[in-house]
Amino acid sequence: MVKIRLTRGGAKKRPFYQIIVTDSRNKRDGRNIERVGHYNPVAQGAESRVVLNMARVEHWVKNGAQLTDKVRSLLKEVSKTQATAA
């Protein structure tokens, strides 16, 4: 099963996550199919908190990929900010 989920990076006490498409059997930081965005939970100032390639996310969801709970909430956050910006 293909999932869209987070993989951790960054330094100790300063996490940074890549939003990736991967097989559910792969390790958290293991092999991925495609990187579709990133999430910085400790963003400050002009740094962006969430960046997603919405076209690619929609493509993968249409092809059967499942979102994890956290990625689903980030997707809602991005769609809200895009709706208020437009």
UniProtKB/Swiss-Prot annotation:
It comes from Xylella fastidiosa (strain 9a5c). The keyword Ribonucleoprotein applies. One of its GO terms (molecular function) is structural constituent of ribosome. Keywords: Ribonucleoprotein, Ribosomal protein. GO terms for biological process: translation. Belongs to the bacterial ribosomal protein bS16 family. PANTHER family: 30S RIBOSOMAL PROTEIN S16, SMALL RIBOSOMAL SUBUNIT PROTEIN BS16M. Gene3D superfamilies: 3.30.1320.10. The lineage of its organism: Bacteria, Pseudomonadati, Pseudomonadota, Gammaproteobacteria, Lysobacterales. This is Small ribosomal subunit protein bS16. One of its GO terms (cellular component) is small ribosomal subunit. It comes from the Bacteria. The keyword Cell cycle does not apply. HAMAP family: Ribosomal_bS16 (MF_00385). InterPro entries: Ribosomal_bS16, Ribosomal_bS16_CS, Ribosomal_bS16_dom_sf.
